[in-house]
UniProtKB/Swiss-Prot annotation:
GO terms for molecular function: DNA binding. InterPro entries: SfsA, SfsA_C, SfsA_N. It comes from Acaryochloris marina (strain MBIC 11017). This is Sugar fermentation stimulation protein homolog. Belongs to the SfsA family. Pfam families: SfsA, SfsA_N. It comes from the Bacteria.
Amino acid sequence: MADWLYQYPPLLAGTLIKRYKRFLADIELDTGEVVTAHCPNTGPMTGMCAPHSRVQISQSNNPKRKLAYTWEMIEVCDTEPTWVGVNTQIPNLVVKQLLQNRLLPTLGEYDQVKSEVRYGREKSRIDFLLTGTAQPAYIEVKSTTWAIEKQALFPDTVTIRGQKHIRELISVLPAAQAYLLFFINRADCTTFAPGDQADPEYGKLLREAVATGVGLLPCRFEITPEGIRYLGLATVEESSLTR
């Protein structure tokens, strides 16, 4: 379809047996074959590893890979059956398309979309830098999969690296614009809030960043075995930013 920002290769359906050692998942395919897939997600994947859940995996023909299969998504049923993206390499590919197609009017006018540019006092790499007629805009992307009811939450664990990224974004103000783009990797969430239960310090820094002028872009996406489409911005409840 024309509105896909990303299309998956043909995927294989199956059922999750277990995730272990962070990067491995045993999966029973619908054919009955049991395979071990690479789990391209270093986080705890809170609420996303229930045995017997439906999953989709991709298969690589690269003979140099140790594992031919990659775990791409899992179906959760928190409020309704919903596919949630597992592969953390996908969000930046999708966001690049989002930016190149000018689908976020909040960002104003820009001519170039640059990726992985070094910046900041702590020598980080920004996911995207927009340059053009207006101020440059620094955009940090965070994949968001944890949800309580219909509220997306980030982070789902303590993230020292994420805290560093917030400090870096604050440091570019006011000479440039700065944004945190939360890639909500599931279609069932309509609101967003900091994951204070998992990382209170991150929540504190996020509120400081917003008060300083860093913009929040909680972007909702629909994940399906066919592809990914943009659903618009989630609502950020003011009460979640005023603690």
